[in-house]
Amino acid sequence: MNSRRLVQKTLCFDKPERIPRHKGILPWAEKNYPEFVQRLHEVFPDDVVPAPSVYIEHLDTRGDRYKKGTYIDEWGCIFSNPLEGAIGIVQTPLVADWQDLDKFNPPQATLSIDREAVNAFCRQTDHFVLMGSFVRPFERFQFIRTMEHALIDLVEKPPELFELLDRIHQHYLKEVEVWASTDVDAISLMDDWGTQQGLIASPDVFRQIFLPMYKEYAEIARHHGKYLFMHSDGHIMDIMPDLIETGVDALNAQIFCMGVKELGEMYSGKITFWGEIDRQNLLPHGTRQDIQQAVYEVWLHLYQNGGVIGQCEFGLEANPENIFTVYETWDALSETERKA
């Protein structure tokens, strides 16, 4: 069974032959452990891959997203990065005063996707292919205003807030439409909604302002026969029912801070858990037995004839041997499931 079909059967809870793999390898790992990363790719090849981000028009970016220093992205948002191999944070707002809003325009170049190049890639691979960028209205709003100003805006709700959000959303609708018209298998959303204990903003803000946006992205995906994948960090238990109702097929979330058993009791069989394994404690500090037990718990509580993609992040301070153990354990559990 090829990778694309394997992932499709997983998303449909149709007894895939094994747990699909998707390694989240950050530049930090590639820089510090290049030989180990190569070994991971050879022994545990991915089943899920991103499409190439090939644009006909030039994206106006400056600097390197993962290098120490300043990086300016295609929207003009300014990121300050104190650490090599990671992503920086925005400290200077692109729209500092609402009077500056008229000067702000989303980057039209991101709509100039080279569809022929993307489609050729999809034809030549049997992997399950995600779109080559992420749709992130909540985070983009924060990048434009900074997180501090954005959260104040969501409390005060000035009319300019809704004008800005509409510009962001209308642009992302076009971007989703362009990607959905290619041969990729899935549309990708990415908004971090949680802190370690709960939501960054209230559930009402999420449901009244941002959930309708996600529903429109989902509608486009469905119209074109695409799956919908989403990443969201933090404790997002309060909005899980909304994401499932919206039509998110696979969710990459910090399942260990929410409780793997609790998630399984409520949502196993209703959504595919696209990873992960605890990257805050277990991957940096856990023993081999800790990692094996963690993977087993995910399988025990979340797997239901599918519904789990073996994903974890090889990022800052992760123990390389623990990453290897994650995928080694997933393969062992897949073998156990086949023999059952």
At which residue positions do the language-model features occur?
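Alpha-helix termini
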Residues: 15, 25, 40, 58, ...
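Short aromatic-enriched loop/helix-cap "lid" or pocket-rim segments at secondary-structure transitions
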Residues: 33-36, 62-67, 83-85, 143-144, ...
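N-terminal capping/small domains of soluble enzymes
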Residues: 20-24, 33, 37-40, 63-66, ...
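Active-site loop segments of alpha/beta catalytic cores
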Residues: 1-31, 103-340
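Acidic/polar N-terminal loop/beta-strand segments that form early-domain functional surfaces
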Residues: 24-26, 54, 74, 82, ...
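An N-terminal domain-start capping segment
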Residues: 44-51, 89-104, 133-144
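A contiguous, low-structure linker/loop signature
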Residues: 62-110, 124-128
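Segments that shape or occlude catalytic/ligand-binding pockets
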Residues: 28-64
